Amino acid sequence: CYVAGDRDDAYYHAVIDAYLEEELKLAQWGQFSVLGHLTLPVRCINEMRHKAISFQPHMAQIEEILRTIIPKGIGIECNTNRGNTPLPDADILKLYRSLGGEIITLGSDAHVTNHLGCAIPARQELLRDCGFRYFTTFDRMKPSFQVL
């Protein structure tokens, strides 16, 4: 993820809006099992540009995306983000669950081997705290629910 230069917060929120518009198009298309990296722009902006941008102003867009994928049986990924802030955060995970979302996978975002499986137990606990009882694995695009 690349975010150009040091800009004001309005610029970064415009980047997030554009990203979420594309995520919504992807959700409407719906030919996949799990939507990953839902909150990627915030991670990139906050980590690379040392900002504290929040997804709160974009929750209506997030909710629209979630309301689009849930009836299609599409899940979301809970990414451990290398042990940093989980992606998405607890607010979005709780929203997904409250809307009826059940399919949730765990990813470690391992770009290097020492991040492989990083923080999975902590994210399992987070999922339990957000109301999930299972996480999902797939075999040939068929979901299988594993007890948390």
Where are these regions (language model features)?
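Extended substrate/RNA-proximal surfaces in nucleic-acid metabolism proteins
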Residues: C1-P71
